[in-house]
């Protein structure tokens, strides 16, 4: 893996609480997150894998690893973007996610792009 990535992949995240899929009384809080990946660099790159670390408000951690995202391993030309939506279920109304995406450039160089931590929070405060 290269210390300096061969291209720049920008990651942005939007989250949403899903009350219609949640059951707070059963400690079941559903969230959707939309990830946008944009290739702002000079080289084409393909997403190989993802690694998520999901933490609830009580400190319970789930790790998710796998190839690509939502069944795809998109290839992004310079200037291109790819957007997908997925979800996570927590046992608490608040939590966080962070992780990494592993990519390979069109010259065969592997590199990792960090996904900064983002918050998952139910829109309602439960008493």
From Swiss-Prot:
Coiled-coil ranges per UniProt: none
Residue ranges occupied by any ApaG domain in the UniProt entry: 3-127
Superkingdom of origin organism: Bacteria
HAMAP family recorded: ApaG
A biological process from GO: error-free translesion synthesis
Organism: Acidithiobacillus ferrooxidans (strain ATCC 23270 / DSM 14882 / CIP 104768 / NCIMB 8455)
Protein name: Protein ApaG
Gene name as annotated: apaG
PROSITE patterns documented for this protein: APAG
One Pfam match: DUF525
């Amino acid at each position: 893996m290269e210390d300096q990535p061969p291209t720049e992949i920008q990651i942005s995240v939007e989250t949403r609480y899903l009350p219609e899929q949640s059951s707070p009384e059963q400690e079941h809080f559903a969230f959707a997150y939309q990830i946008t990946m944009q290739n702002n660099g000079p080289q084409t790159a393909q997403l190989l894998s993802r690694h998520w670390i999901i933490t609830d408000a009580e400190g319970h951690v789930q790790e998710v690893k796998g190839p690509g995202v939502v069944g795809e391993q998109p290839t992004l030309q310079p200037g291109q973007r790819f957007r997908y939506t997925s979800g996570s279920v927590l046992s608490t109304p608040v939590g966080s996610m962070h992780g990494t995406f592993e990519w390979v450039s069109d010259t065969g160089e592997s590199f990792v792009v960090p996904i900064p931590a983002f918050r998952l929070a139910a829109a309602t405060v439960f008493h």
